[in-house]
Design a protein with these regions (language model features):
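Intrinsically disordered, low-complexity, mixed-charge
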Residues: 2-99
Length: 99
């Protein structure tokens, strides 16, 4: 009798709302590069009020690394606050910049 091995990875999903000097400083592009390097899925976008939002999915420990990066951002950014909200996974297959 053959034994089957199943590997289950819990997908953790969050929404982020980043406040501060986060537009016009390559925040979205840098966030996308960071997410891709961590093999996370989701999106990032600018908002009309000058903030940046993101939806990120992946293993909890890796998502937490991304959150830590978001609190710093790229060198030109000045992040004042990051709001974090748990949400349901949407099963994205890549990470993109929404316009």
């Amino acid at each position: 009798m053959k034994k089957l091995l199943f590997l289950f990875v819990m997908v953790y999903a969050i929404k982020l709302h980043i406040k501060g000097k986060v537009q016009g400083v390559n925040y979205r592009y840098s966030a996308m590069q960071q997410a891709i390097s961590l093999q996370l899925c989701g999106w990032v976008k600018n908002n009309a009020d000058g903030t940046v939002s993101a939806h990120v999915e992946g293993p909890k420990e890796i998502v937490e690394l991304f959150i830590a990066w978001c609190k710093q951002g790229p060198p030109e950014a000045q992040v004042l606050h990051v709001e974090i909200e748990n949400t349901e996974p949407k099963n994205f297959t890549d990470f993109t910049i929404l316009r």
